[in-house]
């Protein structure tokens, strides 16, 4: 029989995989199991009552987490002229058009969010095969194709996240770091769930928030009792 690693033994000691934990208990358990030398991200997987094969039920949206995700968000802005000065003024790390496009073509991507003004989208559209699979392609529905650069950059840097369901109808997203206070983790999670409920497709019937599982970068998942979340029912 293969010997369990120290980390696996730790999970086995603390975790009952069949149990649904109170949110506070679940967060506390994750903190006990987070023994890595780096500060692990705190991730959530939310199983939704949607049919992902039906395009009308697929979900893609943004929301702002009240406490951010615990790291500096680097923003790229594709634009030209006076808008370049505006983007730099409000803190975008990478600003420009043709030079920035050529950099991305080399697959050197050092930013977390890409924003573009509408006038340059005919140029930026060629980056779809590179930025699209990474979830970085500017999109008007996500507020990342806009003339309002100040607003878009501030949102990106203040904890705005972009989420969409996978082919199984599950949302996977980071909502912070394991060293966040429990209250801040819960408030971030509740903000996400509130946004998801507002995005519920009219065609979705029955239970919408079916399951919530929290984990860290290196841990097993912990199922959460939905009754202990403020707005998941």
UniProtKB/Swiss-Prot annotation:
One matching Pfam family: Ribosomal_L1
GO terms for MF: rRNA binding; structural constituent of ribosome; tRNA binding
Family label: Belongs to the universal ribosomal protein uL1 family.
InterPro entries found in the cross-reference section: Ribosom_uL1_bac-type, Ribosomal_uL1, Ribosomal_uL1-like, Ribosomal_uL1/biogenesis, Ribosomal_uL1_3-a/b-sand, Ribosomal_uL1_CS
Signal peptide range: none
Source species: Buchnera aphidicola subsp. Baizongia pistaciae (strain Bp)
UniProt keyword RNA-binding, yes or no: yes
The protein, known as: Large ribosomal subunit protein uL1
Organism lineage: Bacteria, Pseudomonadati, Pseudomonadota, Gammaproteobacteria, Enterobacterales
Assigned keywords, A-Z: Repressor, Ribonucleoprotein, Ribosomal protein, RNA-binding, rRNA-binding, Translation regulation, tRNA-binding
GO BP of this protein: regulation of translation; translation
């Amino acid at each position: 029989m293969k010997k369990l690693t120290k980390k696996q033994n730790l999970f086995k000691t603390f975790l009952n995989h069949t149990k649904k934990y109170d949110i506070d208990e679940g967060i506390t358990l994750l903190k006990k199991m987070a023994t890595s030398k780096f500060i692990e991200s705190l991730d959530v997987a939310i199983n939704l009552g949607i049919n992902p094969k039906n395009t009308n039920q697929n979900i893609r949206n943004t929301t702002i987490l009240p406490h951010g995700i615990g790291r500096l968000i680097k923003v790229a802005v594709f634009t030209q002229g006076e808008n370049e000065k505006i983007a730099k003024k409000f803190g975008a790390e990478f600003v420009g058009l043709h030079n920035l496009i050529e950099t991305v073509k080399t697959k050197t991507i050092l930013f977390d969010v890409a924003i573009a003004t509408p006038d340059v989208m005919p140029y930026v559209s060629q980056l779809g095969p590179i930025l699209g699979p990474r979830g970085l392609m500017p999109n008007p529905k996500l507020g990342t194709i806009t003339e309002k650069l100040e607003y878009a950059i501030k949102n990106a840097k203040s904890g705005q996240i972009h989420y969409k369901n996978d082919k199984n109808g599950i949302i996977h997203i980071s909502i912070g770091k394991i060293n966040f206070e429990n209250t801040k983790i819960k408030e971030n999670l509740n903000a996400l769930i509130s946004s998801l409920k507002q995005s519920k497709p009219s065609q979705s019937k029955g239970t919408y928030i079916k399951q919530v599982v929290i984990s860290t970068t290196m841990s097993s998942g912990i199922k959460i009792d939905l009754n202990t979340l403020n707005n998941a029912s």
